């Protein structure tokens, strides 16, 4: 079509049935019409080649099959003979035939796995496979329950073999393999043998049985804790498999879980999808697949009728298609690969690695003091024997005494080595991951929990994250006439525009779309597609509610799907009357710039002059300033001789109209942004929308401030490194951005400004930025599978407020582990000092091996359980983030550790030296009573220090404690077992029952640690080492 320069050239109307027609021509050769003919490529050649064309070849093939005549009249017959011999070699198993199918699972899987074209030909190409699977390429499988069960029994389920669940006893055995516990076990056995030999049963067995019982208690608690964590992580792994896939079943398009896919399903794939099973290409356009995860080849592969093989686990980089599933689960190449890979769930997080270094250092210090303690304790008896000349004469009592000293030394190592550090990290991460799942965040990488707590910048998408992603067209400018959509005063909107413009607009919307209008089981229209496509299709139905009329006619022959680089989608239609028409839609400025004509208010095609162009740009700006997303729709009549092999033109279009789409800001986003700001986290908005829309939304969200800068991607890309260095600290909005712009910004923030960056992404092209960021956050609803695979955390509800919740939980994990480390180091220091100084000055250790093992369990397992599972509070988001270079053990922690250790050691030393006088203890029984009081006081010091450790800076440590059932349970359990240990298990724990007064004084000394801790917190220290002064807003 050509428009006149002067006057009105009327727009050619499309055929009535051509508006919505989306009939795609067959992309594979038709099946042979002659009985027994196989649709091999060789049978569809033009007449004159190979001795008489396809029909004669089919006839010869048929006669050959019936009469077994060994004649070779053509190449086609040769190929056919080979095919018949292959087919005759395949025998359908009886159980498969009985279930109503004509091909077994292994034969079917081998076709795609080996890309066996000959075998595919033998089975009748795509249509033959579909027939043998009892499915329809158009309508998919029938979902009758019995039929689905039969199909599942024959072909299997789409699940991979899971690693065998480790039993509880395996975790117990793993805990028993600890070197220090093995040494203690040997000591216990030796103690039992010597004790029973010298003192008889049961008196001689008390020490040994006590140590064994303590070891078993420690091992069982540790094993139970680790077993529970493994179950939690397995549940989280199952959540990762909850992927919805679009299929056609019973002729209806619907979503099913990836695990429910079966061979015979017709699956719809689009850009960013991960291929959910092995299968064959049915139809589609421009399908480009990344097979590197399977083949290692970095070059993407085109999938079409000539190369119809789609492999599970590969990713769709471009285009869209429909696929016939042929193999699922462990019969796919991906499933077989998964079977030979080891479970990677045991990788340590960065914080665990750092803490292992701390644990090793403390362990070496503990070993040094343990050796010294053993030497000091043993030198008395050994020295005396040397003086008496009895070095070679040892009684059972002498051996037991040395053994006791050795057990104390080994137990000091057990106490000193903080095995609880990695346990605390794992516990805290497991607890946080489970709670975050309830808060709509799926953690894919454990390290993300820690890192998110240090985040200083969040780079967020707009659509669906800051906004609701529930889009509707609220304004439209067609033929220069702007209307309010859904206005009660204009019920028949199409009457506002020329008929020819409405028909062209409908043709554009219904054909140039990745969405689809289908009829659901209730007979009502249902729209499937992205929120943008849904909004446009709803608008089209409002203009002309009868979609059925527009289902036939034009054929889609070429599609260029939308991507964030081109910011447009284009389609070529083959018209019923001949010729081709291109339709294009996308970012308003970009598509309008590609137009040189437009449809005026009379329905005429007129040149797009500067005045009209300026007017349309003003409309775009007006829509955008109202926070509306704008799309421009245009078309172009293709010249005679156009070939579908050519590229879709980028210029020469006729503007049909502009629509304004409302995507409301999510409730609570403004408050969440304010929370981030108070927490020292700056929020940047990165969007593909134009700058006016972006600024309006950013102001509404509270992201764009008076001093902030909003900039477009094109301008951002032109900046030099020096200019970016000055710009980025003030930049709060990046509009019309490409994925490369996002990647560049994230890289600069991390390297030049040393920020810890969290970035959101939903598209395939966002994968580089998600990997570049410290924390990649993918959208669970709008996000593609490629984006989710590249992310550390999946935001299941696509809500910005959930991102803030993840940041809060990340800080909680980090702070909880700091609390535990502070608590544990205090116990370590005091236990070492008490036993070492007592050994040096009195020749005895007041804390025995059994007692130290009990303290170790309080400190390691129970302490980790209590402090590492503290839920986050709002105060966490009122402090500055730790950042990339923040110290883990801060000055605040050292202040608390030193202050509390000095108090506890002073109490222990006072009781050691003045305890007998204080309690009036005399006689042979005085030592064991005093040692029991020291042990009891020491334990209660840890109980109350555990409460004080709930807050490292705040004095009010009781806030929220009543609501923390785990913490209260640990405290109650510790006190209960301490009472049992002291009052009733004295023979095993080297204790004796205490009086009420002695209990009260022990508890009082422990309680006094709380006001002492509060007073220590009043001592001002620098909370963190000074961070970078060059912070972004």
From Swiss-Prot:
Keywords attached to this entry: ATP-binding, Calcium, Calcium transport, Calmodulin-binding, Ion transport, Magnesium, Membrane, Metal-binding, Nucleotide-binding, Phosphoprotein, Translocase, Transmembrane, Transmembrane helix, Transport
Stretches of the chain found on the membrane's Cytoplasmic side: 1-180, 225-268, 383-405, 844-846, 949-965, 1020-1033
EC number(s) recorded for this UniProt protein: 7.2.2.10
UniProt main location, coarse: membrane
GO cellular component: intracellular membrane-bounded organelle; plasma membrane
InterPro entries: ATPase_P-typ_cation-transptr_C (IPR006068), ATPase_P-typ_cation-transptr_N (IPR004014), ATPase_P-typ_cyto_dom_N (IPR023299), ATPase_P-typ_P_site (IPR018303), ATPase_P-typ_TM_dom_sf (IPR023298), ATPase_P-typ_transduc_dom_A_sf (IPR008250), HAD-like_sf (IPR036412), HAD_sf (IPR023214)
Catalyzed reactions per annotation: Ca(2+)(in) + ATP + H2O = Ca(2+)(out) + ADP + phosphate + H(+)
Residues that bind Mg(2+): 762, 766
Regulation: Activated by calmodulin.
Localization, UniProt: Membrane
Active site: 461 (4-aspartylphosphate intermediate)
Pfam family, one: Cation_ATPase_N
UniProt GO MF annotations: ATP binding; ATP hydrolysis activity; calmodulin binding; metal ion binding; P-type calcium transporter activity
Transmembrane segments: 181-201, 204-224, 269-289, 362-382, 406-426, 823-843, 847-867, 928-948, 966-986, 999-1019
Membrane-topology descriptor: Multi-pass membrane protein
Family affiliation: Belongs to the cation transport ATPase (P-type) (TC 3.A.3) family. Type IIB subfamily.
Chain's role: This magnesium-dependent enzyme catalyzes the hydrolysis of ATP coupled with the translocation of calcium from the cytosol out of the cell, into the endoplasmic reticulum, or into organelles.
Entry comment, domain topic: The N-terminus contains an autoinhibitory calmodulin-binding domain, which binds calmodulin in a calcium-dependent fashion.
Protein name listed in UniProt: Calcium-transporting ATPase 3, plasma membrane-type
Gene encoding the protein: ACA3
């Amino acid at each position: 079509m050509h428009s006149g320069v002067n006057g009105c050239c009327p727009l050619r109307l499309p055929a009535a049935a051509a508006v919505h027609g989306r009939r795609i021509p067959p992309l594979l050769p038709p099946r042979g019409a002659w009985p027994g003919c196989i649709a091999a490529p060789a049978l569809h050649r033009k007449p004159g080649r190979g001795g008489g064309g396809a029909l004669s070849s089919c006839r010869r093939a048929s006669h050959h099959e019936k009469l077994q005549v060994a004649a070779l009249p053509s190449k086609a017959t040769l190929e056919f003979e080979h095919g018949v011999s292959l087919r005759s070699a395949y025998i359908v198993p009886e159980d498969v035939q009985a279930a109503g199918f004509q091909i077994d699972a292994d034969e079917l899987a081998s076709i795609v796995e080996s890309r066996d074209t000959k075998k595919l030909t033998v089975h009748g190409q795509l249509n033959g496979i579909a027939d043998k699977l009892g499915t329809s390429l158009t309508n998919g499988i029938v979902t009758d329950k019995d039929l689905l069960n039969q199909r599942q029994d024959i072909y299997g389920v789409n699940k991979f073999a899971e690693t065998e669940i480790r039993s509880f006893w395996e975790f117990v055995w793993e805990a028993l393999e600890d070197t220090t516990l093995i040494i203690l076990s040997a000591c216990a056995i030796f103690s039992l043998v010597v004790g029973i030999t010298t003192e008889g049963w049961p008196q001689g067995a008390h020490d040994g049985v006590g140590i064994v019982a303590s070891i078993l208690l420690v091992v069982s608690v540790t094993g139970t804790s680790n077993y529970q964590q493994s179950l939690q992580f397995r549940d989280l792994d199952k959540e990762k498999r909850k992927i919805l896939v679009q299929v056609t079943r019973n002729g209806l398009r619907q979503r099913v879980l990836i695990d429910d896919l079966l061979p015979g399903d017709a699956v719809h794939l689009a850009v960013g999808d991960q291929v959910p099973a092995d299968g064959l290409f049915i139809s589609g356009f421009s399908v480009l697949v990344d097979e590197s995860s399977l083949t290692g080849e970095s070059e993407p592969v085109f999938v079409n009728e000539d190369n119809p093989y789609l492999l599970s686990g590969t990713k769709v980089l471009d285009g869209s298609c429909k696929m016939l599933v042929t193999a699922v689960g462990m019969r796919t190449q991906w499933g077989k690969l998964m079977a030979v890979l080891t479970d990677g769930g045991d990788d340590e997080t960065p914080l665990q690695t750092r803490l292992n270094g701390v644990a090793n250092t403390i362990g070496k210090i503990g070993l040094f003091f343990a050796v010294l303690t053993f030497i000091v304790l043993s030198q008395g008896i050994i020295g005396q024997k040397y003086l008496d000349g009895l070095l070679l004469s040892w009684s059972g009592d002498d051996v037991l005494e040395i053994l006791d000293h050795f057990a104390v030394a080994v137990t000091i190592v057990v106490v000193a080595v903080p095995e609880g550090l990695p346990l605390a990290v794992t516990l805290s991460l497991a607890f946080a991951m489970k709670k975050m799942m309830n808060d709509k965040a799926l953690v894919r990488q454990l390290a993300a929990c820690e890192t998110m707590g240090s985040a200083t910048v969040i780079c967020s998408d707009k659509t669906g994250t800051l906004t609701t992603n529930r889009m509707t067209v609220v304004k439209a400018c067609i033929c220069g006439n702007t209307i309010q959509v859904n206005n009660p005063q204009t019920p028949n909107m199409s009457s506002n525009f020329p008929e020819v413009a409405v028909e062209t607009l409908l043709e554009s919307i219904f054909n140039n779309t990745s969405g689809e209008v289908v009829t659901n089981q209730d007979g009502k229209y249902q729209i499937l597609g992205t929120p943008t496509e849904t909004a446009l299709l709803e608008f089209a139905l409002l203009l002309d509610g009868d979609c059925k009329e527009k289902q036939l006619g034009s054929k889609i022959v070429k599609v260029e799907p939308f991507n964030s680089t081109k910011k447009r989608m284009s389609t070529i239609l083959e018209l019923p009357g001949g010729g081709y028409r291109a339709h294009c839609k996308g970012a308003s400025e970009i598509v309008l710039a590609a137009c040189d004509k437009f449809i005026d208010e009379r329905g005429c095609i007129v040149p797009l002059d500067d005045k009209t162009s300026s007017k349309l740009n003003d409309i775009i700006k007006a829509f955008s300033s109202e926070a509306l997303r704008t799309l421009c729709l245009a078309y172009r009549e293709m010249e005679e001789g156009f070939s579908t092999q050519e590229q879709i033109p980028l210029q020469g279009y006729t503007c049909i109209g502009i629509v304004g789409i409302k995507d409301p800001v999510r409730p609570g986003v403004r408050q969440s942004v304010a929370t981030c700001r108070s927490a020292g986290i700056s929020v940047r908005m990165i969007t593909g929308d134009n700058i006016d829309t972006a600024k309006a939304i950013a102001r509404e969200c509270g992201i764009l401030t008076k001093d902030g800068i909003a900039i477009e991607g094109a301008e951002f890309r032109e900046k030099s490194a020096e200019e970016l260095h000055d710009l980025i600290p003030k930049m709060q909005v990046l509009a019309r951005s490409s994925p490369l712009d996002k990647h560049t910004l994230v890289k600069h923030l991390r390297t030049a400004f040393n920020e810890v960056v969290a970035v959101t992404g939903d598209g395939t092209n966002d994968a580089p930025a998600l990997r570049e960021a410290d924390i990649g956050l993918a959208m669970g609803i709008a996000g593609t599978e490629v984006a989710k695979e590249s992310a550390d955390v999946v935001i299941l509800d696509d809500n910005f407020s959930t991102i803030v919740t993840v940041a809060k939980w990340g800080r909680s994990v980090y702070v909880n582990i700091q609390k535990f480390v502070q608590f544990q180091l205090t116990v370590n220091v005091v236990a070492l000092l008490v036993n070492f100084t007592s050994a040096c000055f009195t020749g005895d250790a007041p804390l025995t091996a059994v007692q130290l093992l009990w303290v170790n369990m309080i400190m390691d397992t129970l302490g980790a359980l209590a402090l590492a599972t503290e839920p986050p509070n709002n105060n966490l988001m009122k402090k500055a983030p730790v950042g990339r270079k923040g110290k883990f053990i801060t000055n605040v922690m050292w202040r608390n550790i030193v202050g509390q250790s000095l108090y506890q050691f002073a109490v222990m030393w006072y009781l050691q030296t003045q305890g007998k006088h204080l309690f009036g203890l005399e006689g042979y029984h005085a030592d064991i009573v005093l040692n029991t009081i020291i042990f009891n006081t020491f334990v209660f010091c840890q109980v109350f220090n555990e409460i004080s450790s709930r807050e490292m800076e705040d004095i009010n440590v009781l806030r929220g404690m009543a609501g923390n059932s785990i913490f209260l349970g640990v405290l109650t359990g510790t006190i209960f077992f301490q009472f049992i240990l002291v009052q009733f298990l004295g023979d095993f724990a080297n204790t004796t029952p205490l009086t009420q007064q002695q209990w009260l004084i022990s508890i009082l000394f422990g309680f006094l640690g709380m006001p002492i801790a509060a007073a220590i917190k009043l001592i001002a220290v620098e909370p963190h080492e000074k961070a970078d002064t060059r912070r972004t807003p």
